[in-house]
Amino acid sequence: IFLTLAGSTSAGGCMNLYSDLIKYNMVDAIVATGASIIDMDFFEALGFKHYQGSQFQDDTELRKNYIDRIYDTYIDEEELQACDQTICDVANSLEPKAYTSREFIKELGKFLKNNAKKKGSLIETAFDNNVPIFCPAFTDSSAGFGLVMHQEQNPNKHITIDSIRELRELTEIKVKSKQSGLLM
């Protein structure tokens, strides 16, 4: 069973449910957006918070106060930058080569095992239970900024995200399965 995630489900309070699905062996793999995995789950595992706001707030005013808005959810820009820096730091610690998002997210899970301020994130739970998380649009999130910083700091030896190899991995899982399903 593939669990698919999109949108602000962490800020909406659904990540505990998703973690339980992993703990009780009800999903075999996760396919998620970068926003769900990085901007929501990883961000909160670092000890940062999201705040309920309004989708009608003036973005210019929010920006003046260093507040980012994802529809009706607010994030402190300085905390988001700290999340970006952590992504960069994890990338800097890895062997320079191509990784799928699944492989990189597994490294984030390993990082969270020792460094999470909020235990029990989806990434950490998936890591603990050997459930792969795929994120086909991985850089369409705060992770993209962290990886740009990593590549700027390491122009000749850096990691990359190999989305083609990832698509092949996902396809192979589906082809090898006698039965499969999606939980959306």
Question: Where do the PLM segments sit?
Answer:
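Conserved catalytic alpha/beta core of Sir2/sirtuin-type deacylases, generalized to analogous enzyme cores
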Residues: I1-L5, S10-L183
